[in-house]
Curated annotation (Swiss-Prot):
Pfam families: PID, WW. It comes from the Eukaryota. Residues 29-61 form the WW domain. May modulate the internalization of amyloid-beta precursor protein. The keyword Secreted does not apply. This is Amyloid-beta A4 precursor protein-binding family B member 3. Residues 438-460 are annotated as: Disordered. Keywords: Cytoplasm, Nucleus, Repeat.
Length: 486
């Protein structure tokens, strides 16, 4: 991923393609049972649903030569594949370049509840993942290593250890709050994984691995963390995007329910009431993460978001002066504040930070065209925005993931605080009604403190609650998106 204009944040890639519509699947009269006619960018071909095989030639009906002529021809048709091609398992469709959106009969697809997504996958097995490998800056590397390890052995004949689904073709159904893995032939349940128990997920970032998807979850029987890897029939970013959207929906629904119930319950809401989309966020709130980097400087920008805006600002700062003029700094990232201090030659020396920014003011983060460069845009107020850039070794992946996790923690805190304010407002309203007061009720939620942003000029004053990280993650809450992990 590094080296491309990817943004290592929640709103990386908006998937505009209708990956899950069934308009490309056509039921045509005259086809043998189980066959579907497919039209896509590759052309028109035919798909045998039960076996997963595909062919360019239209399937034909043929009479079995050994049938009794006296029985006639009705009801004894036999399906024979074209010469030189046999009905194989799903392997053939998984390895071809054309992607099939659905892998199931039309009737079963229509029976899925609204919003459910269906994908054809093949289990490649699992690899144990140590807890420490899921820390920010390490989790993406760990998941990618698991994908590479299992993908390389995909075509080798290895004995299975009895793990559910290993080496099998499956249907992955994403709906509501669970991921279900089904047998593609009889739709029997192989495994059901609650989404709130998934620690982290990712898509293969190496060349040729864009159809490999993995997620890490705890195994209740063995009490270990397992990274399960699948090879997908569509680009794996579609699964990641669907999963991201479902988790965002769970998060917003839980907070909405908590806010409505606040008027009836005196109990305060806690972060534990919210689903844990990615538990690596917990590590960010425990202690600040520290990274050594070269502080390139700051630059005013015209917009709060956009990879083009970020790349232009990073390019300007890069061309401004020699690399020797950049200041070696220790960048501290917590769930509330990011601070860059100059690395002092003399022990015990104390100076003002080179740069400081509350996480709640961050509107956009990303890795530049050079994989060593990382930048973020902050909202200074009064429609004023500022970009800060850093040069990282060996690359900016670790820093970008840590900042992204901090933004997610801050977003969860915003949601909890919003629901808590609604609960407090309801309590005040009930109290005032009991006292029969007619005076107006003020909002219990006061303004946020003025932005603290050192290292450059910016507007002062109170910041609205929805500015900064809250608006930055609006896309995560409202529409599916992709976190492409390296």
């Amino acid at each position: 991923m590094l080296g491309k204009d990817y943004m290592l944040a929640i709103i990386l890639v908006n998937c505009d393609d209708d990956l899950w519509g069934d308009q490309n699947l056509e039921g045509e009269t005259g086809l043998p049972p189980g066959w579907r006619k497919i039209r896509d960018a590759a052309g028109t071909y035919y798909w045998h649903v039960p076996s997963g095989s595909t062919q360019w030639q239209r399937p034909t009906w043929e009479l079995p030569g050994a049938e009794d002529p006296g029985r006639g021809t009705e009801g004894i048709w036999e399906l024979r594949p074209p010469k030189g091609r046999s009905f194989s398992s799903l392997d053939s469709s998984l390895n071809r370049s054309n992607s099939l959106t659905w892998y199931s009969e039309d009737s079963y697809v229509r029976s899925l509840e609204p919003g459910a997504k269906c994908f054809a996958v093949r289990s490649l097995g699992w690899v144990e993942v140590p807890e420490e490998d899921l820390a920010p800056g390490k989790s993406s590397i760990a998941v990618n290593n698991c994908i590479q390890q299992l993908a390389q052995t995909r075509n080798r004949s290895q004995p299975h250890d009895g793990t559910w689904g290993e080496g099998q073709n499956m249907l992955m159904i994403l709906k509501k709050d669970a991921m279900s893995l089904l047998n593609p032939l009889d739709h029997s349940l192989i495994h059901c994984q609650p989404l709130v128990h998934i620690r982290v997920w990712g898509v293969g970032s190496s060349k040729g691995r864009d159809r490999d998807f993995a997620f890490v979850a705890g195994d209740k029987d063995s009490c270990m963390l397992k990274c399960h890897v699948f090879h997908c029939d569509v680009p794996a970013k579609a699964i990641a995007s669907a999963l991201q959207g479902l988790c965002a929906q769970i998060l917003s629904e839980r907070v909405g329910v908590s806010g409505e119930a606040a008027c009836c319950s005196p109990d305060p809401i806690s972060p534990e009431d919210l689903p844990r989309q990615v538990e690596l966020l917990d590590a960010v709130s425990q202690a600040a993460q520290k990274y050594e980097a070269l502080y390139m400087g700051i630059l005013p920008v015209t917009k709060a978001m956009g990879m083009d805006v970020l790349n232009e600002a990073i390019g300007t700062l890069t061309a401004r002066g020699d690399r020797k003029t950049w200041v070696p700094a220790m960048l501290s990232v917590s769930d509330s504040l990011m601070t860059a201090h100059a690395i002092q030659a003399e022990a015990g020396a104390e100076e003002e930070p080179l740069w400081q920014c509350p996480v709640r003011l961050v509107t956009f983060i990303g890795v530049g065209r050079d994989p060593h460069t990382f930048g973020l845009i902050a909202d200074l107020g009064c429609q004023s925005f500022q970009c800060a850039a850093f040069w990282c070794e060996p690359h900016a992946g670790g820093l970008s993931e840590a900042v992204q996790a901090a933004c997610m923690v801050q977003y969860q805190k915003c949601l909890v605080a919003s629901a808590a304010r609604g609960k407090a407002w309801g309590a005040q309203a009930r109290a005032r009604l009991r006292l029969k007061r007619t005076s107006s009720m003020d909002s219990p939620g006061g303004p946020l403190p003025p932005p603290l942003l050192k290292g450059g000029a910016g507007g002062a004053g109170a910041a609205p609650r929805k500015r900064g990280v809250f608006s930055f993650l609006d896309a995560f809450r409202l529409k599916p998106s992709l976190l492409h992990m390296s």
